[in-house]
């Protein structure tokens, strides 16, 4: 019996007040995934997130219960301590991807990307 569940993406936007602010767009906004399948979500920034110090400050979070979010991936592709290796991050410049190779029931929740290359 196939039991679909939802992985929800959250569209993260800084309200633009000037043309220099970075706008983040995440797709898809939701996924129907069965445990064991692969999930993939993308995040695009309106400007390159490559900082002058050589790092790219792109993070992925999972939110299961408000207001608590769990850091999964930092600086594009580094797994935070304790995050299973089925989670992976990739990308550069303006385009980034989070993949979950074999989704487990505990993975369901709201995922979002965040940049820290520029303050809002």
Swiss-Prot record:
Residues 44-59 are annotated as: Complementarity-determining-1. GO terms for biological process: adaptive immune response; immune response. Residues 60-74 are annotated as: Framework-2. Residues 114-120 are annotated as: Complementarity-determining-3. Keywords: Adaptive immunity, Cell membrane, Disulfide bond, Immunity, Immunoglobulin, Immunoglobulin domain, Membrane, Secreted, Signal. One of its GO terms (cellular component) is immunoglobulin complex. Residues 21-120 form the Ig-like domain. Residues 82-113 are annotated as: Framework-3. InterPro entries: Ig-like_dom, Ig-like_dom_sf, Ig-like_fold, Ig_V-set, IgV_Light_Chain. Residues 1-20 form the signal peptide. It comes from the Eukaryota. Immunoglobulins are composed of two identical heavy chains and two identical light chains; disulfide-linked. This is Immunoglobulin kappa variable 2D-26. It comes from Homo sapiens (Human).
